[in-house]
Amino acid sequence: MSYKLSIVKNKMMKRIINILILLCCIASLSSCGNSTEERSRVLKIYNWADYIDEDVLAEFPDWYKQQTGEDIRLVYQVFDINEIMLTKIERGHEDFDVVCPSGYIIERMLKKDLLLPIDRNFGRTPDYIPNVSPYIRHELNKTSQPERQTEDYAVPYMWGTAGILFNKKFITPEEASTWNILWTPKNRSKILMKDSYRDAYGTAIIYAHARELADSTVTVEQLMNDNSPQAIALAEKYLKEMKPNIAGWEADFGKEMMTKNKAWINFTWSGDAVWAIEEADAVGVELDYTVPREGSNIWYDGWVIPRYARNVKAASYFIN
C-alpha cells in the first residue's frame, strides 16, 4: 500500500513540477512580449485621483494617432500626497512621462533640476498652451529659477483654496469663519486634517499670526514661505495644541467620514470640498465650505515632464 502511495505521490509531484515549468514559460514569454514594446509607444501618467475626465484618457490614443500617425498606450497611476510623488522621481528615478504636482513641488523640482522643458513643436497641431489664464501663469512664474522660467517647464491645470468643510448640523457658518474652529475644545476628535505637510504648516502659522494678518503687517504668502526655525517651532507648537481635536489625517477618505457624520469639520482643498458637498447632498447631509477670514493658501497644480521621462513627445502632446 505504501509503495503504491509513493508512486501516486511521485506522479503528482511530477505533474505539479510540469505545471510550474509551464507557468514559468508563459510568464517569461509574457514579459518578453512587454519588453519588445517600444517605450516611445507608451505614455506613463502620474496624477491625482479623480482629477481628469476619463473620456480624455480614453480618447487620447486616437487623437494622438490622428496628430502624429503613431500609436500610443497609456499607463495611468494616481497619487494622493505630493511628497510621495516627488520621492519616487527624485530617489527612485521613476520614468513617468507626465505628472501633475502642486506649485511648491514644481518649484522644488525646478531647483533640483528634475524637470524637462515642454516641447512645443506640435507640427500641424495647434499650440493651446498660450490659452492658460495670464493670472495663473503669472502666479506660477513666481517659482521661476535663474535662467529658467517656470512656464517653459509647467502648464497650470487646476487652482483653488484650502479651507474648512463643515457639517451645518453641528457647526455654524460663523464658527467656520475663523481658523479658531480647529482649536475649539467643542470639536474634540471631530476634525479631519488633509494629509499635506505644507497645508498643515500653513494653517498653524496663519492662526499664530492672526493679529498681524488683521493689521496687514504680514501677508499669507510671506507666512507660507517662512521656513525659519522660529516659524517651524511656532507651527509645531500650535499643531500639538490642535492634536486632541484631530480625528485623523486623510488623503482621500474625508468625504466619506463627513457624509456619515463621523467628523464635523474637514480641513481640505476646495476641489475635494465640492465633491464632498455633492455626495453628502445625495444622502441628505448638508455640508458647506468656507475660507476663514484670516486668509488661506491658494494652490496651483500643473503638468510637468520629469527628468527621467522617456516619452517627451507624447507627454508634450498630452499636456497641450
Question: Which residues does each predicted region cover?
Answer:
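Hinge/lid segment of periplasmic solute-binding proteins
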Residues: 86, 107-159, 173-180
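Extracytoplasmic/periplasmic substrate-recognition and gating elements
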Residues: 272, 279-320
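Alpha-to-beta junction loops
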Residues: 91-100, 114-115, 187-189, 260-268
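C-terminal motif of bacterial Sec signal peptides marking the signal peptidase cleavage site
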Residues: 28-31
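Short loop->beta-strand "edge-of-pocket" segments that line small-molecule binding or catalytic clefts
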Residues: 181-199
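Short helix-loop capping/hinge motifs at secondary-structure junctions, enriched
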Residues: 170-177, 209-217, 309-315
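Ligand-binding pocket segment of bilobal, Venus flytrap-like solute-binding proteins
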Residues: 192-193, 200, 204, 212-288
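Early extracytoplasmic/lumenal segment of secretory-pathway proteins
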Residues: 35-112
